[in-house]
C-alpha cells in the first residue's frame, strides 16, 4: 500500500491485505457492541421496501427521520479500525442505499413530491451533514504531501 501511486492501487492493495488477513468474516458479521446493527438493518429493509413500492411519501419521511450523521453510532471510529479498507458490510450497504434513495428522489419527476419539498429535504440534509472542507496545514514543508492528497481526491471526483 505504501508504494501505491493512485487511490485505486492503494484500495486494491488494502482489499487484498484484508482478504489475506481474513477480515471478511468481521465485515460480514453484523453483530457488534459498538453500533446499533438492529436499527441499521431495519432501516435498510425499510428504505428498500419503500423505494421498491414507489412509496414516495414514506421514502421522504424515512429519509428525513434518518438525517443523523452518526445514526446508530455507525460513525464510531472503532468500526473503521478493523480493516484496511471499509467497515461492516451492513454499514456500507446502508450508506449505499441511502445514497440510492436520495438519487431516486432527486432524479425522478415524482408527482407526490413537489420540487419545493425536494429542495427542503436536500436543504435539511445540508444542515444535518454540513459541507465538507479540506484544510491543508503545515506550510511548504508539507506541500508535497498536500499535492498528493489533492491529486487523489481530484482523481476520485471529490
Question: Residue locations for each model-derived region?
Answer:
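Patatin-like phospholipase
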Residues: 1-158
